[in-house]
């Protein structure tokens, strides 16, 4: 046996049916599409139309809304801030503000401010001036000898465009 002698087993493949090639072919005239109507025509069917069945986008419940007044805060863990201090990206003597976090590359595209979360360890004594901080983050910061000032006004419109 040679590579050029290899072929499929008898009956393993079937020739494709060529439709619309005369009544003697078995798939002539309407070519298996039935008679007339939208589905007999060429082209794509209507988007979202499911043959009369209630379409998915109408079956699903209408719930909730998008709150236009919601604050979009970037979340940062204290462990990430400690890494930045250890790497020399954050100055421990200066207050930790949105501008400082942006400059250190910890956050990007800040909209309404930054929220500090309490995951990780913090050993540096830092002063935070941020929009929000979780209870666990405040406890960890104060345990390390630091302080937290929370105010949504801590971020002005100039930071949002940065």
Curated annotation (Swiss-Prot):
Residues 21-35 have a biased composition (Gly residues). GO terms for cellular component: cytosolic large ribosomal subunit. One of its GO terms (molecular function) is structural constituent of ribosome. Gene3D superfamilies: 3.100.10.10. InterPro entries: Ribosomal_uL15, Ribosomal_uL15/eL18, Ribosomal_uL15/eL18_sf, Ribosomal_uL15_bac-type, Ribosomal_uL15_CS. Coiled coil: none annotated. Residues 1-13 have a biased composition (Basic and acidic residues). GO terms for biological process: translation. Residues 1-37 are annotated as: Disordered. Binds to the 23S rRNA. Belongs to the universal ribosomal protein uL15 family. Part of the 50S ribosomal subunit. HAMAP family: Ribosomal_uL15. This is Large ribosomal subunit protein uL15. It comes from Methylobacterium nodulans (strain LMG 21967 / CNCM I-2342 / ORS 2060). The gene is rplO.
């Amino acid at each position: 046996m040679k590579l050029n002698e290899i072929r499929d087993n008898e009956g393993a493949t079937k020739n494709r049916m060529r439709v619309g090639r005369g009544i003697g072919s078995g798939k002539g005239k309407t070519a298996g599409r039935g008679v007339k109507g939208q589905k007999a025509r060429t082209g794509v069917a209507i988007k979202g139309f499911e043959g009369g069945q209630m379409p998915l986008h109408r079956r699903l419940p209408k719930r909730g809304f998008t709150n236009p007044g919601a604050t979009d805060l970037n979340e940062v863990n204290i462990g990430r801030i400690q890494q930045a201090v250890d790497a020399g990206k954050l100055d421990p003597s200066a207050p930790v503000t949105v501008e400082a976090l942006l400059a250190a590359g910890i956050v990007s595209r800040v909209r309404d401010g930054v929220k500090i979360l309490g995951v990780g360890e913090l050993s540096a004594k830092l002063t935070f001036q941020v929009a929000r901080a979780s209870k666990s983050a405040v406890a960890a910061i104060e345990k390390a000898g630091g302080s937290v000032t929370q105010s949504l006004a801590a971020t002005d419109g100039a930071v949002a465009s940065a």
